């Protein structure tokens, strides 16, 4: 699927106080390896994550999912927002090319998400860009032969920036070379596309 508008951004949308509150909440958790696969591979992903479920965070991000879905005319139907992921990338840490959408809907082991799969992805930039180097979000769009198919999303460099994009878009986080990049990531899940 080639999209007219493959992502929607809100540069510096959240206040420093809101970012500080999210960071404090995430750092209060015991951060675990971000490798979610059954076969650990730091060549694909090296980061640390914590899972957050505070209602105020869902209230904060839900309008961004709604606004992007309508303004970009994706018009995806979704029923749930999955557990939120606080992510930290330190020097040498990264996340290689991947898509967030699963190949099949979630099975019974995923409880309330059974029968759903990821449709929209959201990321909030929680670090000041002066606090780290590298760690850039890159998205791939369009036809593979296009020279501009890979785009570094510089619009979300300022702290408090938000991006929403379809979960089937390939994307990555380039290696952090200095400092620490912090983000809050979320996914809106819905029934399979017809």
What are these regions (language model features)?
Residues 1-164, 168-194:
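Fe(II)/2-oxoglutarate oxygenase catalytic core
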């Amino acid at each position: 699927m080639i999209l007219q508008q493959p992502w929607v951004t809100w540069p510096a949308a959240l206040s420093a106080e809101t970012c500080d509150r999210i960071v404090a909440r995430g750092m209060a958790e015991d951060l675990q390896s971000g490798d979610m696969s059954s076969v650990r591979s730091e060549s694909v992903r090296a980061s640390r994550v914590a899972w957050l479920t505070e209602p105020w965070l869902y209230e904060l991000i839900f309008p961004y999912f709604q606004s992007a879905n309508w303004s970009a005319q994706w018009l995806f139907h979704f029923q749930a927002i999955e557990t939120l992921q606080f992510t930290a990338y330190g020097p040498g840490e990264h996340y290689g090319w991947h898509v967030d959408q699963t190949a099949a809907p979630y099975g019974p082991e995923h409880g309330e998400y059974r029968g759903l799969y990821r449709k929209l992805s959201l990321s909030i930039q929680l670090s000041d860009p002066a606090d780290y180097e590298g760690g850039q979000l890159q998205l791939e769009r369009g036809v593979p032969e296009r020279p501009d198919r890979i785009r570094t999303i510089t619009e979300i460099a300022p702290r408090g920036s938000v991006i929403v994009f379809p979960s089937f878009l390939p994307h990555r986080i380039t290696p952090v070379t200095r400092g620490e990049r912090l983000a809050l990531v979320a996914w809106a899940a819905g029934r399979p596309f017809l």
